[in-house]
């Protein structure tokens, strides 16, 4: 017990910050630097242990190669990457609001998780502020429109006559309405009916299902294929023979949001054959409606369901339900995070996997493994239809398609196997 009381414990709370400051000072003096990072031809002198501790991407680079020179190509400016690496020493990062998405993309590529979290929080905060401002503007517009409606109702109440009905009153009551107003309303109704019958085509009459002017329906175009949507080309306009009114369960939330915003979103050129009925009974294209307020257009369309989103954070939250990963650079989605990381490396032009024999570089580890089969002579990919084997998986797929006429996922039945063996 006496020996334990002689032990003194010291805790240096500022040790980490002091060490980083001294390491940054050594970096500025180019002392003990063991690696040079080239970001779009901009050099950054640093220490591998510091960079590897802050960036998973840099750690993998240092494990794959022992070179003292690492080259990184990013689509953002070199200043963005340089500041990200500098933050490994300073523990601070200054980001302009308009460049927040650039830093988020570059930090995602360098796999600097702590910076990605901060940028995501800041981005969500600013987007919520913008959304609240737009909602306030929309509320003001709604209030002004409600005021106009109330004024119209008050004016209409002045022309109405209140009739009290008692028990002694006869069953058939004659309501005394001004004759001139009755004639005017009747003539206006006849004119509106004839105008609608003249403007409405036979094709659109088949689509009309008795809905009121303010009701919302969704037109489902069955003739449009996925390839046509991606290419933005459509063979013909939407007609009644190709369109049907339906309300699937997957679109309930979309219908609710459409009712709240009173906005219809039609992607690409599909709106060339769609028509909407105005309040006066005339027909106009959807383009004319969308031109009234382009700020409410849905910029992000979910690839798995018909949902569309205006803001990035809502779109990202929705993709988590489908277990999808989004590339912030081009908007492409992936089912696995490793495929997203490989895709981002393709954007940046980075080939982190290098062959130790010929020093050739690759974007994916699987491609490097196939390449190593050339040096080792291994042929691990075997055809289940015959006895041939291949070094590369792509060669096996090509063999199955050209020789056996089937994909790699298909398997032969027993009669087919016997026939192949006889051949």
Swiss-Prot record:
The keyword Transcription regulation applies. Residues 33-97 form the BTB domain. One of its GO terms (molecular function) is zinc ion binding. The modification Phosphoserine is found at residue 201. Keywords: DNA-binding, Metal-binding, Nucleus, Phosphoprotein, Repeat, Transcription, Transcription regulation, Zinc, Zinc-finger. SMART domains: BTB, ZnF_C2H2. GO terms for cellular component: mitochondrion; nucleoplasm. A zinc finger (C2H2-type) spans 300-322, 325-347, 353-375, 381-404. May be involved in transcriptional regulation. This is Zinc finger and BTB domain-containing protein 6. It comes from Mus musculus.
């Amino acid at each position: 017990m006496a020996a334990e009381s002689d032990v003194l414990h010291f805790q240096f709370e500022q040790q980490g910050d002091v060490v980083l400051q001294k390491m940054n000072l050594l970096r500025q003096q180019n002392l003990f630097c063991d690696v040079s990072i080239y970001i779009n031809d901009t050099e950054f002198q640093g220490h591998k242990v510091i960079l590897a501790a802050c960036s998973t991407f840099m750690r993998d680079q240092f494990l794959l190669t022992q070179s003292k020179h690492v080259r990184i190509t990013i689509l953002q400016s070199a200043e963005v990457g340089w500041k990200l690496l500098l933050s490994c020493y300073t523990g601070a990062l200054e980001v302009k609001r308009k460049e927040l998405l650039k830093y988020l993309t570059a930090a995602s590529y360098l796999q600097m998780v702590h910076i990605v979290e901060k940028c995501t929080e800041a981005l969500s905060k600013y987007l919520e502020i913008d959304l609240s401002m737009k909602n306030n503007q929309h509320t003001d517009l709604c209030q002004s429109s409600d005021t106009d409606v109330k004024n119209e109702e008050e004016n209409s109440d002045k022309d109405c006559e209140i009739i009290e009905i008692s028990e002694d009153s006869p069953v058939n009551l004659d309501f005394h309405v001004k004759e001139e107003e009755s004639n005017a309303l009747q003539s206006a109704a006849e004119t509106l009916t004839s105008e609608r019958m003249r403007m409405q085509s036979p094709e659109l009459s088949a689509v009309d299902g008795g809905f009121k002017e303010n009701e919302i329906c969704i037109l489902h175009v069955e003739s449009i294929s996925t390839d046509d949507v991606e290419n933005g080309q459509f063979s013909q306009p939407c007609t009644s023979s190709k369109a049907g009114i339906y309300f699937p369960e997957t679109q309930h939330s979309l219908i609710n949001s459409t009712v709240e915003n009173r906005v219809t979103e039609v992607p690409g050129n599909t709106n060339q054959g769609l028509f909407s009925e105005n309040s006066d009974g005339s027909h106009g294209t959807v383009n004319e409606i969308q031109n009234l307020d382009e700020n409410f257009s849905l910029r992000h369309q979910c690839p798995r369901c018909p949902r569309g989103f205006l803001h990035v954070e809502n779109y990202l939250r929705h993709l988590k339900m489908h277990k999808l990963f989004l590339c912030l650079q081009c908007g492409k989605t992936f089912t696995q995070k490793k495929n997203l990381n490989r895709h981002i490396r393709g954007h940046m032009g980075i080939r982190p996997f290098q062959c130790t024999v010929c020093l050739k570089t690759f974007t994916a580890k699987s491609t490097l493994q196939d390449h190593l089969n050339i040096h080792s002579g291994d042929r691990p990919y075997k055809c289940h239809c015959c006895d041939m084997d291949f070094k590369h998986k792509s060669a096996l797929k090509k063999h199955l398609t050209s020789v056996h006429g089937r994909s790699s996922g298909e398997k032969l039945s027993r009669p087919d196997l016997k026939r192949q063996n006889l051949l």
